[in-house]
Regions:
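Alpha-helical transmembrane signal-anchor/signal-peptide segments
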Residues: 33-38, 127-145, 150
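PDZ-domain C-terminal substructure recognizer with occasional recognition of PDZ-binding tails
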Residues: 150, 156-157, 171-212
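Residue-level signature of transmembrane alpha-helical entry/exit and packing/kink sites
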Residues: 3, 7-11, 95-104, 111, ...
Length: 360
C-alpha cells in the first residue's frame, strides 16, 4: 500500500499532467484551425472509461505511458472511404502544411510552456535559496591563502562588481586564469580589498569532459539565505531556469550521440517513479520543479526527428512543403516502423538500466 501511495500514485499523477498538457496542445491548435478531433486519450490501448462530448470522445486508456489525439483524416490509408465535402473541410490532411506543422509542434511546445509556468509557480511559492558568499575553508598554498584571505571573510565585490551569491564568485573567477582580480571582502566590521591571481586548473564538467578553469582555492561555508521573490522576480527566475534546463537537455542529447554521456546513465519510468516517490515523501513542493524538468525532457524528446514522434512527423511535413506533395503511405509506414523499432529499443535500454540500478 505504501509503495502505491508514495511511488506509483505520484508518478501517475505527474505523468498524467504532463501527457494531458502535451495532448491539449495538439487538441487546441487543431480546433483553432478547424480540424475535427475524433478522440482525446490519456493513455494507450484499450479504453478504461470514456465520454462523448460534442464531436470528440474523451478517453482514459489502460496503458498510462502516453496519450494521443485522433484527428479526422489523420493516418488514413489509401483504401479508406472518401470523406464528404463537409467532412473533408474539417480533416487534418485538408489543412495547409504549415498549419499541420503547427498542430504537430503544439504538443511539445505546450510541455515547454508548462515547464515555464511550473517553474514560475515554484519560485512564487518558495522563493530561492542562495549560497552566502562566505569563505568556509581555504586551500593550503593556494592563491587565496597567499593573497591573505581568511575563513569567515564575506566576498562583497569582485573588480567593483557587487557579489550577492556564491555562484557569482565562480562565474567571475573561472575565466580569469592568470589575471589579477581585486576582491573586496567584509571581515568583522571592516572592508578590505585583496588582489589575487587565479591559477589554471583542469577539472571535469557534468558530462565528465576535461575543462580548464580558474581557481583561487576557497570553499563556501555552505550557509544559505532564503530570498522571497516578487511575481516579476519569480517570472524572471522561472524563464531563465526553463531556458537553462532546455539548453542542458539539448546538450545532453548531443553528448549521447557523441558517446560522451554513457547510455547506461539514461533512466526510464522506474527511475522517474522512484524519484517522484522520494520527492513526494520529502516535500510535495519539490515535485513542482521536478515536474517542470520532466516536462522539458518530454517536449525535447518528442521534437527529435524520429518517425512516430512529433519531430518525425514534422520532418514528413517539411518534406511535403519542399517537394509539393506528401510522402506515400508506404514510405511513411516504413519510416514509422523504423521509428517504432528505435523507440522500443530505447525503452528496453532505459528499463534495463532502471532494473540494474534497483538490483545494485
Amino acid at each position: 500500500m505504501n509503495i502505491f501511495l508514495y511511488y506509483i500514485l505520484p508518478f501517475i499523477v505527474v505523468l498524467g499532467i504532463l501527457i494531458f498538457f502535451h495532448e491539449l496542445g495538439h487538441f487546441l491548435v487543431a480546433k483553432y484551425f478547424g480540424v475535427k478531433v475524433l478522440k482525446f486519450s490519456l493513455g494507450f490501448g484499450s479504453k478504461l472509461v470514456g465520454r462523448q462530448i460534442g464531436e470528440t470522445e474523451y478517453l482514459i486508456s489502460v496503458i498510462p505511458l502516453g496519450g494521443y489525439v485522433k484527428m479526422l483524416g489523420e493516418g488514413e490509408n489509401e483504401d479508406a472511404e472518401p470523406l464528404s465535402p463537409e467532412e473533408e473541410e474539417k480533416s487534418f490532411t485538408s489543412k495547409h502544411t504549415l498549419k499541420r506543422i503547427a498542430i504537430v509542434a503544439a504538443g511539445p511546445f505546450f510541455n515547454l510552456f508548462l515547464a515555464l509556468f511550473t517553474f514560475c509557480l515554484f519560485y512564487m511559492i518558495a522563493g530561492i535559496q542562495i549560497g552566502v558568499p562566505e569563505i568556509g575553508q581555504i586551500t593550503a598554498n593556494s592563491p587565496a591563502q597567499e593573497a591573505g584571505f581568511l575563513e569567515g571573510d564575506v566576498i562583497i565585490a569582485i573588480e567593483g562588481k557587487s557579489i550577492g551569491a556564491w555562484s557569482e564568485i565562480k562565474d567571475a573567477v573561472q575565466y580569469s586564469s592568470g589575471i589579477p582580480l581585486e576582491i573586496t571582502v567584509k571581515r568583522g566590521g571592516s572592508l578590505l580589498t585583496l588582489t589575487v591571481i587565479p591559477e589554471e586548473s583542469v577539472g571535469k564538467n557534468i558530462f565528465g569532459e576535461d575543462v580548464k578553469t580558474g581557481l583561487i582555492g576557497i570553499v563556501a561555508s555552505g550557509r544559505l539565505q532564503a530570498v522571497a521573490l516578487s511575481p516579476l522576480g519569480a517570472a524572471k527566475e522561472g524563464f531563465w531556469k526553463t531556458w537553462e534546463v532546455i539548453k542542458l537537455t539539448c546538450l545532453t542529447v548531443i553528448k549521447l550521440f557523441q558517446r560522451v554521456v554513457p547510455i547506461k546513465t539514461l533512466g526510464g519510468p522506474i527511475l522517474i517513479s522512484q524519484m517522484t516517490g522520494q520527492l513526494a515523501q520529502e516535500n510535495l513542493l519539490y515535485l513542482i520543479p521536478f515536474m517542470a524538468v520532466i516536462s522539458i525532457n518530454l517536449g525535447i524528446l518528442n521534437l527529435l526527428p524520429v518517425p512516430i514522434l512529433d519531430g518525425g512527423l514534422i520532418i514528413f511535413l517539411l518534406i511535403e512543403l519542399v517537394i509539393g506533395k506528401p510522402l506515400s503511405i508506404k514510405q511513411q509506414e516504413i519510416a514509422q516502423k523504423i521509428g517504432l523499432f528505435l523507440l522500443v529499443t530505447l525503452m528496453a535500454v532505459v528499463i534495463f538500466n532502471d532494473v540494474t540500478r534497483l538490483l545494485e
